[in-house]
Amino acid sequence: MKHIATLLFSLALFSVAANADDKPIDFQQLPSSAKTFIKSEFPMESISFIMKDSDLLDTTYDVHFASGLKIEFGSNGEWKEISRTSSPVEIRFVPKQIVSTVSSRWPGAEFKKIERYRHGYEVELTNRLELKFDKKFRLTEIDD
């Protein structure tokens, strides 16, 4: 019985892995709201490449820019994550309440990454802290 369960689990895992598909795409293949966001918020940025990641449950789009900026969009075209490798993320994308909490508790820290989830936000700071906030922008977790 254990062997059958192990076999079924292995087949299910293989099936999920086989359905995962990362492929490069053109700008025109992005959802329209993602294209609009990029054109309005980052008109001077040069796109290096775009990857479409399709799996069993979701599709995401990773847009990589020459400057080190990376934006991940969900299947609906709304941004899910904004990060930069060489400079801070612009605070205009970070809710004011989160900016206020960070600037009062960690003066001088800047944002390297912001992720937006259904249940809240996660930010990574230049001082290497990772912070989680709930929907009401309350700090719920600190990871150093």
What residue spans do the PLM features occupy?
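Bacterial Sec-dependent N-terminal signal peptides
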Residues: M1-P24, I38
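Interaction-mediating elements
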Residues: D21-D144
